A protein has these predicted regions:
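Sec-dependent signal peptide cleavage junction
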Residues: 17-33
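Aromatic-lined, polymer-binding surfaces characteristic
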Residues: 186, 190, 194-204, 212-257, ...
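Bacterial N-terminal signal peptides
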Residues: 9-19
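Well-ordered alpha-helical scaffold segments within catalytic/enzyme domains
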Residues: 37, 50-58, 105-122, 137-145, ...
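Long, well-ordered core segments of solenoidal/helical folds
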Residues: 48-60, 77-79, 131-147, 216-233, ...
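Low-complexity, Ser/Thr/Pro/Gly-enriched N-terminal "stalk/linker" regions
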Residues: 28-99, 103, 134-181
Length: 345
C-alpha cells in the first residue's frame, strides 16, 4: 500500500539522519557507487512527510501547504452521531482505516522516539509531530467509550466504484462508519492503536504533556478492551488480519516503555513468546511481531528475544534464504517490495 511505503521511507531516512549533517542547499542525488554529491536525506524526509499531507482528510486550513487540497470527508461519523473526521485516506482510495492510520502514526512516532535530535537538525521535528498528531487526533475520536473503537469510514463496494478527489468523497460515496465492541472484537486493531497512542504519549511529553496524558489514557483503555475481548477484526478483503497477538504485544511493550508497569511487559512476552517468531518476514502493517521483539529485547536484554531478532536479520542477509535482485535488492514480495527491504535496512 502506498501509505505503508511512505511510512518505511520515513523509517529509513531517519536511520540515516543520525549521522548526517544537513545544510539548507539541495544537493544532486548521484549514485553512491560512482561517487559525487551526497543524497540530501533531510529533503527526502521532507518530501515523504508531504505525502501524508496530500492524504489528509478532514478540516484543512485555508492556507494549506498544498493549495489543490481542501476539506474532505467532513461527514465521517455523522451516521453514528460522532465526529470521525480527520486522519489519512488509504492507498489512493478514500477509505479510512484505523488499523493503517495507527500503523502509520506509530511508525512515525517510533522514528521520533529513536531519532528526535536528527529531526531537530533537519528542521522537521515540528512537521513530523504535527503530522503524527493529525493521525492520533483521529484515533482519539475513534475511541468514544472504553470498549468502543471505530475501525473504518467508507467501504470498498462504494469507494472503489469511483476515481474522484478526496473532496468529493462524502458527496459521491457512502461514508458508513464501522465499529468494534465486545460483540465485534478486533484485538489486532486495538493493540496497534494502543501502541500508536502509547508512543504518542512518550514523544509529546516534552512539548504537550496534557496531550500526552490524554493519549496514554486512551491507550490503556483501548489495550484493555482488545485484551479482554479477543478476536481478529471483521475485515476479510481489505487489510484482513493474520493474527492479533503481535498487535497486543506491540501495544503492551510500548505501554511498558511509557509507564514502567511490568504487567505490560509480561503481557507482551505472553503474546509473543520467544518460540513464536521465525525468520521469514519483517515488520509491516499486518505483522508487528518483529518490531515488538526488538523492543522487548532492548528493554529486557533477554537472549531469547535477541536471538529472534538476529535470526530474522540473518535471513535477510545475502545467502540467508531470501531472493536478491540482480541489482542487490532483497526481494520478499511483488506487492510493495521496497517497503519490506527498507524497514529491514
Amino acid at each position: 500500500k502506498r501509505l505503508s511505503r511512505a511510512i518505511i521511507t520515513i523509517l529509513v531516512t531517519s536511520l540515516l539522519l543520525a549521522s548526517t549533517v544537513f545544510t539548507p542547499q539541495t544537493h544532486a542525488a548521484s549514485s553512491p557507487r560512482t561517487g559525487g554529491a551526497f543524497y540530501n536525506y533531510g529533503e527526502a524526509m521532507q518530501k515523504a512527510l508531504l505525502f501524508y499531507k496530500a492524504n489528509r482528510l478532514g478540516d484543512l486550513p485555508d492556507d494549506y501547504i498544498l493549495p489543490y487540497r481542501t476539506d474532505a470527508a467532513m461527514t465521517d461519523g455523522q451516521d453514528v452521531g460522532l465526529d470521525l473526521t480527520g486522519g489519512w485516506a488509504d492507498a489512493g482510495d478514500g477509505i479510512k482505516f484505523t488499523h493503517t492510520i495507527s500503523y502509520a502514526a506509530g511508525q512515525l512516532g517510533w522514528n521520533v522516539y529513536e531519532y528526535r535530535e536528527a529531526f531537530e537538525k533537519a528542521g522537521q521535528l515540528d512537521v513530523i509531530l504535527d503530522e503524527i498528531k493529525w493521525g492520533t487526533d483521529f484515533l482519539l475520536k475513534a475511541h468514544p467509550e472504553p470498549d468502543v473503537l471505530y475501525y473504518m469510514c467508507g467501504y470498498n463496494d462504494s469507494d472503489h466504484g469511483y476515481w474522484i478527489p478526496h473532496e468529493l468523497l462524502d458527496v459521491i460515496t457512502d461514508r458508513k462508519s464501522f465499529v468494534l465492541n465486545p460483540s465485534t472484537p478486533g484485538s489486532d486493531i486495538a493493540g496497534i492503536t494502543a501502541g500508536a497512542l502509547a508512543i504518542a504519549s512518550i514523544i509529546f511529553e516534552p512539548t504537550d504533556p496534557e496531550y500526552a496524558e490524554k493519549c496514554l489514557k486512551h491507550a490503556k483503555e483501548i489495550f484493555a478492551f482488545g485484551d479482554k475481548y479477543r478476536g481478529k477484526n471483521p475485515l476479510d478483503v481489505l487489510y484482513p488480519s493474520g493474527s492479533y497477538l503481535d498487535d497486543l504485544a506491540w501495544g503492551a511493550i510500548w505501554l511498558h516503555i511509557k509507564t514502567g508497569d511490568s504487567t505490560y511487559l509480561e503481557k507482551a512476552k505472553e503474546c509473543l513468546p520467544t518460540t513464536s517468531l521465525g525468520g521469514g518476514h519483517t515488520h509491516c502493517w499486518d505483522d508487528v511481531s518483529y518490531g515488538a521483539a526488538l523492543k522487548i529485547a532492548q528493554v529486557t536484554h533477554d537472549e531469547g528475544y535477541v536471538a529472534m531478532v538476529e535470526k530474522n536479520l540473518d535471513w535477510w542477509m545475502p545467502n540467508g534464504g531470501l531472493t536478491y535482485s540482480p541489482g542487490g535488492l532483497a526481494w520478499l514480495s511483488p506487492w510493495g517490495s521496497l517497503r519490506y527491504a527498507a524497514v529491514v535496512a
